[in-house]
Amino acid sequence: MIIGSFQSVRNEVDMPSAERYGVEVVRRITGGGAMFVEPGNTVTYSLYAPSSLVAGMSFAASYAFLDDWVLQVLRELGLNVWYQPLNDITSDGGKIGGAAQKRVAAGAVLHHVTMSYDVDAEKLGQVLRVGGVKLSDKGVGSVVKRVDPLRRQTGLERQVVIDRLVGGFGARHGLVEDRITEDERRRAEELISEKFATEEWLHRVP
C-alpha cells in the first residue's frame, strides 16, 4: 500500500489487516490518494523530465499532457478512455488508474501513474480505509465497482499490455535503453534506509 505524501497512515490503512496479509505500507513524495499496489496486479510507470516540458501549464493541464500517450495506446487496444481531472484515467466501466506529480527543486517534474491490471477485492476491502473506517465495514462493492482493471477490459496478459505501452511511448517520443548505474543504485538504497524506510517518514503528520 502506497500512501500519498500528505496522507495519514491511520486514516488510510488498517494496519492489523495489512500485517495479516503481509502488505507493506510506504509513503511516497508525491501527493494524491492511497494506491493498493501488488506485483502482477498493477502497471506503473514514472516520467522524470525537465520542468520546462510543462512550463506555463496548470497542474491539471500538465497531468493530461504527460499521459496523453497512454490514452492513445489504450484506445488502440479498443478501450473508450479519457482523462478525468485532476488525475484519473477512466473508462466506461470505471477508473483504470491515477497519476501523481511533484515539481522538484532541481528544476524537474516527477510524474507517475499506477493502473489496475487486476484487483483482489477482499484484500483491498480489509486493508484500505476511507475516512478512518475500514473499507470492508462500509461495503467494498461500491469502490471495486468504480475500478475497471485492464485485465477485464482487454483480455490481454499483463506483459502484453506493458509491451504495447512501451511501444506506444517509443513511437511518439523515442526511446533509448539504459541501465541504472551501481552508484545510482547505491544512492537509492541509502535514501531508503536513511529516510523512506523509517517509521518517522511513514508516520509523519503532514
Where are the model-predicted features located?
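Short, conserved charged micro-motifs
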Residues: 12-13, 54-59, 123-125, 157-160
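Contiguous, small/hydrophobic- and glycine-enriched helical/loop subdomains that border
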Residues: 40-92
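Short gly/pro-enriched beta-turn/loop segments at secondary-structure junctions
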Residues: 84, 94, 108-110
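Long, positively charged amphipathic alpha-helical accessory segments at protein N-termini or as interdomain linkers
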Residues: 67-80, 102-206
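A short beta-strand motif that forms the metal-chelation/ATP-contact edge
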Residues: 89-101
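N-terminal lobe of the biotin/lipoate ligase/transferase fold
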Residues: 1-57
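Short acidic-glycine loop/turn motifs at beta-strand connectors
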Residues: 39, 92-93, 105, 119
